[in-house]
Amino acid sequence: MFRGATLVNLDSKGRLSVPTRYRDQLIENASGQMVCTIDINHPCLLLYTLPEWEIIEQKLSRLSSMNPQERRVQRLLLGHASECQMDNSGRLLIAPVLRQHAGLTKEVMLVGQFNKFELWDETTWYQQVKEDIDAEQSDSGVLSDRLQDLSL
C-alpha cells in the first residue's frame, strides 16, 4: 500500500530516485519491476508494480474492442504502458513520451494511491490540490453513498 506525497527529482536522463521507504517493498513484491502509463483523466502518470499492472491488463482484456469508448481506453492505457526496472541505486527510467505527456521536467511529485503511484509535475500537482480543495468547499453538499459512510 502506497501513501503520501513526496518530492523527487528527475535526473538529466529521465530517471527518478524511488524514496528508500518504498524500495524494499518494491523489490520484495515485484523484484523492482514496474509499469508506467498515462492517466487518461489527469495530466499525470500512473506507476504500478508489474504484478498489480497484470491485474489491470486482465481487466482491460475483458473490455470489448468493438466498443469505441472501451477500445480508446485500451489503446491509451496499453499503448502508453512502459516497463521500467528499478536499478541498484533505486532509480526508475521514465520513458520520454510519458514524461512529455505529464510535463515532467525536474521536480516531480510521487503520490501514493493505494496500489499505485501517480507522478505529477510539482507545479501541476499543487494546482490540482488547490482545485480539489476548492471543489470540495464549493460542493453543494451532496455526497455519494460511499462518502457518506466514510468516517475520518
UniProtKB/Swiss-Prot annotation:
It holds the Pfam family MraZ. Gene3D superfamilies: Transcriptional regulator MraZ domain (3.40.1550.20). Keywords: Cytoplasm, DNA-binding, Repeat, Repressor, Transcription, Transcription regulation. InterPro entries: MraZ, MraZ_C, MraZ_dom, MraZ_N, MraZ_sf, SpoVT-AbrB_dom, SpoVT-AbrB_sf. GO terms for cellular component: cytoplasm; nucleoid. It comes from the Bacteria. Residues 5-52, 81-124 form the SpoVT-AbrB domain. GO terms for molecular function: DNA-binding transcription factor activity; transcription cis-regulatory region binding. GO terms for biological process: negative regulation of DNA-templated transcription initiation. The keyword RNA-binding does not apply. It is found in: Cytoplasm, Nucleoid. PANTHER family: TRANSCRIPTIONAL REGULATOR MRAZ. Forms oligomers. This is Transcriptional regulator MraZ. It comes from Enterobacter sp. (strain 638). The gene is mraZ.
